[in-house]
């Protein structure tokens, strides 16, 4: 008489990184693939000089904008497609340095930054449950889903100013390190060495132009990777490397790891592969051009809630 109550739920995903912030609505319903709506990513302005304080302020501002955008999208979707339930949960993913795995404790460590987000969430979505996760957890979960037979690998997650290295053995994370290098580092190198604008520098990365400045940027990135990886490996390097970066830069960073200076890290050789949206798209329904990191977050959130870990 009254109809069957839908058990579908809408989750807000907030992806906080050190070069951008993204948000998306995730619809979860029994028997259906998780579905993303209203994905949007806000880039943090590229700084000429790096400052932890100014970066944190810029990221917090972008996070506030992302929450406002998500609330507006949720309102429009409820108006035009009433089947989408109201947001019942907020899941926040934080990349280094905001959220990092603590392998000794078996749980992530989170920075106390972004204190203003909690009241912002309440003002826009009400008193809904909120959970925090390290983005590294979502990245590893997605790697296992896309490449279930790769039990020993190194995952390099490239971000704006800080990159993360995760070493997997028997499909478990056994090592974690960070490197103070990312997309921002490369763009600044191209701007200063080649006199390019930020737009030109991004285009050069997308086109893979082999300029002197581009080679210098790749060599610098490879050097920082080598320094972090050498301490992480302990002489047990895996030749299977996966690179996670925002498109269209993933292939550029993957190619940079073919630099000759890295040969000693992988004496047995190996492969370097970019994790692309196409590797994850079969697991998550979406509209338009998918965002690799949001796909990872959606896949992890769906699995976490299904197994009761998302509370």
Where are these regions (language model features)?
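Short, acidic/turn-prone active-site loops that include or flank metal/cofactor-
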Residues: 136-138, 179-184, 271
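Glycine-rich phosphate-binding loop of actin/hexokinase-like ATP-binding domains
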Residues: 152-189
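Generic beta-strand/beta-sheet core signal
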Residues: 168, 244-246, 275-277
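A mobile "lid/hinge" subdomain adjacent to the ATP/sugar-phosphate binding pocket shared
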Residues: 191-227, 248
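Nucleotide-binding motor/catalytic cores of P-loop/tubulin-like NTPases across gene-expression machines
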Residues: 254-294
């Amino acid at each position: 008489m009254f109809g069957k109550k839908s058990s579908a739920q809408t989750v807000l995903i907030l992806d906080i990184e050190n070069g951008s912030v993204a948000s998306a609505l995730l619809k979860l319903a029994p028997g259906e693939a998780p579905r993303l709506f209203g994905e949007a990513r806000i880039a943090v302005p590229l700084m000429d000089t790096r400052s932890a304080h100014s970066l944190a302020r810029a990221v917090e501002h972008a996070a506030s904008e992302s929450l406002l955008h998500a609330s507006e999208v949720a309102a429009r979707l409820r108006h035009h497609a009433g089947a989408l339930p109201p947001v019942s949960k907020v899941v926040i993913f934080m990349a280094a340095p905001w959220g990092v795995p603590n392998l000794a404790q078996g749980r992530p460590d989170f920075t106390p930054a972004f204190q203003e987000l909690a009241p912002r969430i309440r003002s826009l979505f009400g008193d809904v449950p909120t959970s925090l996760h390290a983005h590294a957890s979502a990245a590893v979960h997605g790697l296992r889903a896309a490449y279930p037979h790769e039990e020993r690998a190194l995952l390099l997650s490239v971000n704006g100013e800080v990159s993360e290295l995760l070493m997997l053995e028997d499909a478990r994370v056994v090592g974690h390190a960070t490197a103070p290098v990312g997309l921002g580092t490369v763009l600044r190198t191209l701007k200063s060495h080649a006199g390019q604008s930020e737009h030109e520098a991004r285009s050069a990365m997308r086109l893979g132009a082999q300029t002197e400045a581009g080679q210098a940027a790749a060599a610098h990135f490879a050097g920082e990777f080598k320094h972090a990886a050498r301490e992480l490996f302990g002489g047990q390097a895996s030749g299977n490397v996966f690179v996670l970066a925002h498109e269209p830069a993933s292939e550029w960073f993957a190619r940079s790891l073919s630099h000759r200076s890295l040969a000693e890290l992988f004496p047995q050789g190996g492969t370097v592969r970019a994790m692309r949206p196409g590797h994850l798209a079969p697991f998550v329904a979406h509209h338009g051009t998918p965002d690799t990191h949001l796909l990872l977050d959606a896949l992890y959130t769906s699995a976490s809630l299904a197994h009761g870990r998302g509370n």
